[in-house]
Amino acid sequence: MLEFAHEKFNRLDCICNNAAASRGIGPLESYSLEDVQATLDLTFTALWKCLQAEIKYLKNHPNPASIVNISSNSALKGYAFNSIYAASKAAVNNLTQSAAKELARKNIRVNAVSPGTINTPGVKKYFEDEPSAKEALEKSSLLRRIGEADEVGELVAFLLSERSSYITGQIISVDGGSSIN
């Protein structure tokens, strides 16, 4: 995909990395090594591999560039019964800040967006299966609602744009205040 974009447009200025999956939800002691490895592979390692490939295209790029990684607010304060996913997203946050430090001198900004509960098809399905969860998650937000995907997308678009040219190494929450509640 990177080769196609680079060949078609002869440049690559902005990239959003969004990789996530959780292999099971349950108590920490219930996870198998395979569950842990699969979650890390799909959530952290996949993003890391993308970042490595992107850097090859961007490091000698004459124009400023921006990378946004999608994290999760579970990385900021842990997540009971989904701890491996939370840990994998915490690794994404650390990778984001490490990459920002390494790549700033090449005029490449790297940030992460950390969504809370967002009204996606997967979340809707979860609420169908667990109706009480929706109310509990709405109450955990200072704004008393679930976020919408376009609210995350607007922040990503801003961070990828030149309007955010002085922002790098940041983990920015889009969670209705639930991370501070």
Spans of model-derived segments:
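Catalytic Tyr-X3-Lys loop
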Residues: 13, 29-49, 68, 85, ...
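Short C-terminal tail/terminal secondary-structure segment
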Residues: 22-25, 77, 157, 168-181
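Conserved mid-core segment of classical short-chain dehydrogenase/reductases
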Residues: 22-37, 56, 60, 81-84, ...
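Active-site helix of classical SDR
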Residues: 51, 88, 96
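Alpha-helical segment proximal to the catalytic Tyr-Lys
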Residues: 56, 101-105, 165
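Residue(s) in the substrate-gating loop at a strand-loop-helix junction
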Residues: 72
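A glycine/serine/threonine-rich, flexible loop-to-helix segment
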Residues: 105, 117-140
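C-terminal helical subdomain
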Residues: 112, 135-163, 167, 176
